[in-house]
Regions:
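Active-site catalytic loop in hydrolytic enzyme cores
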Residues: 105-118, 122-125, 133-215, 219-233
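Hydrophobic/aromatic beta-strand patches that form the interior of the parallel beta-sheet core
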Residues: 7-9, 40, 128, 217, ...
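N-terminal active-site segment of His-dependent metallophosphoesterases
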Residues: 1-38
Length: 397
């Protein structure tokens, strides 16, 4: 049975949506050069997670400055050509199949869907990314599943934004919790995403388990230490592989400003890495690298203090962040096995690197020898779960 390489990263949203999508293109090419099959990127990566913003809102009042801030945030969201749909569910499979309206040949939206499909197709990487989607005057915190062969297989919208997120994001319908399925090198992978604190909703988790998923994706904005424990619980509970991705975002202050440096290498159109000559002005290198299994290795320093050159595999770039940096979000992306073992990460304070792990999806079946949360262990003769607008039929392996 072929192994599948799962990968994730902790990049931060760029100043413009076009720049963020261009970054996805770059990350996908790097992922392809590292032979990653499926890549997860963070919650709200396209459009941005407005951490710390209040949008001028308080109980009983909204400011003009806040309205303008929201208008600018709205501009950064992408239009994927979907409808609002019942309860915020969109058009579902009609959107996937481009069957909205009378003419299926008409391109809907702002072209973001087509660009993401191109990136997946060119890189050969199955991409799952968080995005802020706009339609009908509302914003949704969404996730798209982009297959390199078939394009977008599905899209879902966060059913309950957390806390103050409800000021700016509408509720998505639970019908969008539909899992999708793909086959990579003969391995059937059933995957679905739970966004951030949806992972603290037991019935939502059970909704995903009930569709017989073996890959559970958790894009998030939570960088608390407790998050990894939750991901390990999900792995054991669902007997599935779990991939989580969160942005690593440095705090931009006069004392701690991210200084963007050039890369140690570049990726050609064919996916080959070309090492670039080292600039004499650069003296700092990474403190760690990741090996072929996705494990982090701490690098030693020379006694005389000269760091020297860095050679890494997979392609790793010189850190763009000063040592004394404060972080708005520390990242923490990780990959967990069906037995709750952390097989890659957590990736802290590293917006540039990739982490990955080679996995055997038959481990999900082996784990169900003693625990099948959506099978006999669910005791569905005694406990009933129904989801509005969604049939909980298990996908085949």
């Amino acid at each position: 049975m072929s192994t599948i390489r799962l990968g994730t990263a902790s990049p931060g949203t760029q100043p413009t949506t076009a720049a963020t999508i261009a970054l996805i293109d770059s990350i996908a090419q790097r992922a392809a050069s590292s032979k990653i099959d499926i890549l997860l990127l963070p919650e709200a990566f396209i459009g941005g997670y407005p951490r710390g913003s209040s949008f001028g809102c308080q109980i009983g009042g909204r400011s003009e400055e806040g309205r303008e801030e929201f208008a600018k945030y709205f501009d950064q969201a992408i239009d994927l050509g979907d409808t609002v749909g019942p309860g915020g569910g969109g058009a579902g499979l009609k959107w996937v199949k481009r069957q909205i309206g009378d003419d299926s040949d008409v391109v809907r939206g702002d072209g973001s869907r087509e660009e993401l499909e191109r990136i997946a197709r060119d890189s050969g990487v199955f991409i799952v990314t968080g995005c802020i989607e706009k339609t009908g005057g509302s914003l949704y915190c969404s996730v798209v599943y982009v297959c390199p062969k078939e394009g977008m297989l599905g899209k879902r919208r966060k059913v309950l934004p957390t806390g103050s997120e409800r000021l700016i994001w509408a509720q998505g319908a639970p019908s969008t919790l539909r899992a999708v399925s793909t086959i990579i090198r003969g391995v059937r992978i059933n995957l679905a995403a739970a966004i951030c604190w949806e992972n603290y909703m037991p019935l939502l988790r059970q909704t995903l388990y009930s569709q017989n998923i073996n890959l559970y994706l958790a894009p998030t904005a939570d960088n608390r230490d407790a998050w990894l424990g939750l991901m390990r619980t999900v792995g054991v509970e669902g007997r599935c592989f779990v991939v989580s991705s969160n942005m690593a975002v440095p705090k931009e202050t006069s004392e701690s400003l991210p200084k963007r440096r050039r890369r140690d290498s570049t990726i050609t159109e064919e996916g080959f890495e070309i090492a670039l000559p080292r600039s004499p002005q650069r003296a700092r290198r990474r403190k760690s690298v990741f090996d072929e299994d996705g494990n982090e290795i701490v690098l030693c320093r020379d006694v005389d203090g000269d760091d020297g050159d860095t050679q890494t595999s997979p392609p790793v770039f010189t850190s763009t962040i000063p040592e004394k940096t404060e972080w708005i979000s520390r990242g923490g992306s990780s990959i967990v096995s069906p037995y709750g073992d952390v097989v890659a990460g957590p990736q802290w304070e590293d917006p540039d690197g990739l982490i990955y792990s080679d996995v055997d999806f038959r481990d999900c079946i082996r784990g169900r020898l003693d625990l099948d949360a959506a099978g006999s262990y669910s005791r569905n003769d005694s406990f009933k779960l129904s989801v509005e607008g969604l049939e909980l039929d298990p996908l085949p392996y």
